[in-house]
Amino acid sequence: MVLSEELYTQKEAMLYSQRIAQLSKALWKAVEKDWQQWIKPYDLNINEHHILWISYHLKGASISDVAKFGVMHVSTAFNFSKKLEERGFLKFSKRDDDKRNTYVELTEAGTELIVEMNKNYHNTYHSVLEGSLALKDLYGRFPDFLDVMAVIRNIYGEDFIDIFERSFQHFRDSFDTLEERPTVKG
């Protein structure tokens, strides 16, 4: 650790760590509240919605992939996926060339649920979105969080960022389709 100690002081390290911790906690609290309000009408919790979202964008993802990208333990991903299967939103499968891993895919009902939730996004207040509008007005776009992504890449690895980018590209590509589909009556 001699090299690390030469690059920064203990004071700098502690101030940085505490700053990140406090800002992350404050932001997460707002994100969590917004997310819970958005999905409440669908009787889902955040883990369940996240699994549906990941399954939608990473078609045929393994439980391990869902856990990794969902930043949850494999048993958490499996148990919540099981609940979603019982509700008819997910189906489990094994692959002939990979019997060790369990894969999840959305059912038609799961896909329809994701589409409906996306259509109803603006039916609830989103404090994080509202809090970012001044930056969008000033710079013409929402923040990219490139420095945060660099830190996440160093913590979780390139695979995590690749999955993140791939899923968001799929979301961008499919957004028009989501808007065109009829709303499901629940």
Curated annotation (Swiss-Prot):
Would you tell me the protein name for this molecule?
A: HTH-type transcriptional regulator Hpr
Which pairs of Cys residues are joined through disulfide bonds in the record?
A: none
Give the gene symbol: hpr
Q: How does it assemble?
A: Homodimer.
| PROSITE patterns xrefs | HTH_MARR_1 (PS01117), HTH_MARR_2 (PS50995)
Please give the organism. Lysinibacillus sphaericus (strain C3-41)
Question: Where DNA binds (residue ranges)?
Answer: 63-86
Q: Which UniProt keywords apply?
A: DNA-binding, Repressor, Sporulation, Transcription, Transcription regulation
Gene3D superfamilies given in the database record: Winged helix-like DNA-binding domain superfamily/Winged helix DNA-binding domain (1.10.10.10)
Q: Which GO terms describe its biological process?
A: negative regulation of DNA-templated transcription; response to stress; sporulation resulting in formation of a cellular spore
What GO MF terms are annotated?
Answer: DNA binding; DNA-binding transcription factor activity
Q: What does this protein do?
A: Negative regulator of protease production and sporulation.
Q: Say yes or no: keyword Cell membrane present.
A: no
- NCBIfam families listed in its UniProt record: PRK13777.1
Q: Where in this chain does the record put each HTH marR-type domain?
A: 13-157
Q: Which Pfam families match?
A: MarR (PF01047)
Q: Which HAMAP family match?
A: HTH_type_Hpr
